[in-house]
C-alpha cells in the first residue's frame, strides 16, 4: 500500500487475473527505499498465493547470495529479485549456481562456502573493475554521456577506508582520465598510510 501494509487483500485482488508472477518489494510506497524490507509481508504474499500457479518473488535488502537464499527459504517465495545489493558489485552473482542449488535443495546455509557470504574482492580488484566499467562506458556512450555513470562509480566506493571521500570525488568526474587520476591518488595515499602505520 501507499503508507500501510495491505498484502493479503492486494495479492488476492491481483490473483483474480491469474498473473504469471507477482513481485513484492517489501516496503510501502511511502517508505520507498528507507527502512528494512518487510519479509514478513513478503512471506504473507507467498502464503496467499500458495495454491495458485502464480510465482511470488521477493525483493529487498539482499546484499549477498546467502541473504537471497535465506530470505527465499524463510519466506517460501519461488524466487528473489536483487537490486541495490549488486550496485558497485558486479561480482555479486559469481556463486549464483551454488546459491540456486542451495535454494532448490534446501541446503543448510552453514555448509555454504564463505565466498557466498561475502565474495572475496580485494580493494585492488574493486578499483580495477571500476576503471574497466568507466572505460567501457566512455567507449560506448562517449564523453557527452559520461556524467550518467557517476552514480554507478560511486557505488564501487563503499566498505573500505576513505570510501566516502572517494565516492564524493566520483560524483565530479567528467571522463576516464578523471577516474584514473582519483584512483591513482587514492592508491598512492593508501600506500603512504600503510607505510606510516608499519
How does the language model describe each region?
Residues 23-27:
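Short beta-strands and strand-loop turn motifs
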Residues 1-3, 28-35:
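Short, small-residue-enriched loops and turns at beta-alpha junctions
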Residues 4-21, 33, 40, 44-58, ...:
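Alpha/beta catalytic cores of nucleotide-metabolism and tRNA/nucleoside-modifying enzymes
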Amino acid at each position: 500500500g501507499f503508507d500501510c501494509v495491505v498484502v493479503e487483500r492486494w495479492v488476492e485482488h491481483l490473483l483474480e487475473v491469474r498473473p504469471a508472477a507477482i513481485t513484492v518489494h517489501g516496503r510501502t510506497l511511502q517508505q520507498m527505499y528507507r527502512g528494512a524490507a518487510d519479509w514478513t509481508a513478503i512471506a504473507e504474499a507467498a502464503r496467499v498465493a500458495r495454491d495458485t500457479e502464480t510465482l511470488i518473488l521477493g525483493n529487498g535488502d539482499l546484499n549477498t547470495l546467502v541473504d537471497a537464499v535465506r530470505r527465499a527459504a524463510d519466506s517460501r517465495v519461488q524466487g528473489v529479485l536483487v537490486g541495490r545489493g549488486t550496485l558497485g558489485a558486479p561480482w555479486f552473482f559469481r556463486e549464483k549456481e551454488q546459491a540456486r542449488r542451495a535454494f532448490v535443495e534446501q541446503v543448510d546455509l552453514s555448509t555454504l562456502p564463505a565466498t557466498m557470504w561475502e565474495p572475496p574482492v580485494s580493494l585492488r580488484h574493486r578499483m580495477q573493475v571500476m576503471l574497466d566499467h568507466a572505460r567501457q562506458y566512455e567507449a560506448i556512450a562517449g564523453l557527452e554521456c559520461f556524467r550518467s555513470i557517476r552514480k554507478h562509480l560511486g557505488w564501487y566506493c563503499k566498505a573500505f577506508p576513505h570510501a566516502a571521500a572517494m565516492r564524493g570525488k566520483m560524483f565530479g568526474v567528467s571522463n576516464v582520465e578523471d577516474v584514473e587520476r582519483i584512483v591513482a591518488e587514492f592508491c598512492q595515499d593508501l600506500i603512504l598510510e600503510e607505510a606510516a602505520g608499519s
